[in-house]
């Protein structure tokens, strides 16, 4: 596990207002959280001349008033930052991601490996697009590497209706 202070040490997802996810989506979420906690890069830049308390950080993700909310606290629970991102830039990518995931889950049950691999490559491409969008939207608020962005995008998909 990464022991850097520039990381997430806890992740909470507030999905209380959402219908239960499918078993496949729930599994993706569990894997993303596990992988994030094992290895991630999450840095908060100083803002307006203020120092940022050192990490590691706890992240609470939620959707409130049609905005994606990142609520950041220190490991001990002291609030550090909260920022809201418009869901608009994510909607089409999330929709595309859900559609390709459905195709992938269906393909795994009935198609030959070559066709499954082609669908999986498309799925990864859409996933990467979502991760890059997240990195762009976080600019000036938080810095994450591409692997962290990919895993966070998986969690965002759990919060945004596809």
UniProtKB/Swiss-Prot annotation:
Residues 1-22 are annotated as: Disordered. It comes from the Bacteria. InterPro entries: UCP032146. Pfam families: UPF0262. Belongs to the UPF0262 family. This is UPF0262 protein Pden_1958. It comes from Paracoccus denitrificans (strain Pd 1222).
């Amino acid at each position: 596990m990464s022991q850097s202070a520039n990381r997430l040490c806890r992740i909470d997802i507030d999905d209380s207002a959402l219908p239960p996810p499918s078993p496949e989506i729930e599994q993706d979420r569990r894997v993303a959280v596990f992988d994030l906690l094992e290895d991630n890069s999450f840095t908060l830049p100083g803002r307006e001349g203020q120092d940022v308390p050192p990490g590691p950080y706890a992240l609470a993700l939620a959707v409130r008033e049609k905005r994606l909310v990142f609520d950041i606290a220190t490991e001990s629970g002291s609030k550090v930052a909260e920022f809201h991102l418009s869901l608009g830039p994510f909607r089409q990518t999330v929709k595309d991601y859900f559609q390709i995931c459905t195709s992938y889950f269906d393909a795994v049950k009935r198609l030959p490996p070559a066709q499954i691999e082609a669908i999986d490559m498309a799925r990864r491409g859409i996933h990467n697009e979502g991760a890059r969008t997240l990195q762009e939207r976080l600019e000036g608020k938080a810095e994450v590497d591409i692997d962290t962005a990919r895993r966070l995008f998986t969690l965002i998909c759990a919060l945004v209706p596809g």
